[in-house]
């Protein structure tokens, strides 16, 4: 039996994964590599502007989806001036998958 805190955390992960847009964001973060000639993103983090461009979503919509992903612990954010850079927390996905296997 999972502890109540673990159940709440897993519920947040499922909520985050319930959206096609958020799953697409996770896909982009998982394949993140710098684009030639671009300096906005490193090999392991992606700027919100790149997510907006790739998905064709408004920056405010990206911000909403990133808030849900952050609340679930699936991504981390780093602010640099007016830009926010996001990183996938693979260990959080692995942990959620392990919890599912134990059910």
What are these regions (language model features)?
Residues 8-15, 20-58, 80, 84-92:
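N-terminal helix-turn-helix DNA-binding core of bacterial DNA-binding proteins
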Residues 66-67:
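Short, hydrophobic-biased segments on the C-terminal half of alpha helices
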Residues 1-8:
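Long, low-complexity, charged/polar intrinsically disordered regions in eukaryotic proteins
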């Amino acid at each position: 039996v999972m502890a109540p805190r673990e159940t709440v955390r897993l519920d947040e992960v499922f909520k985050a994964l319930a959206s096609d847009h958020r799953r697409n964001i996770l896909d982009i973060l998982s394949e993140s590599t710098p684009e030639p000639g671009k300096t906005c993103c490193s090999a392991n983090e992606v700027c919100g502007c790149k997510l907006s461009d790739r998905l064709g979503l408004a920056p405010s919509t990206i911000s909403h989806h990133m808030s849900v992903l952050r609340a679930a612990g699936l991504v981390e954010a780093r602010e640099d001036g007016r830009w926010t850079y996001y990183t996938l927390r693979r260990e959080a996905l692995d942990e959620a998958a392990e919890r599912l296997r134990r059910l």
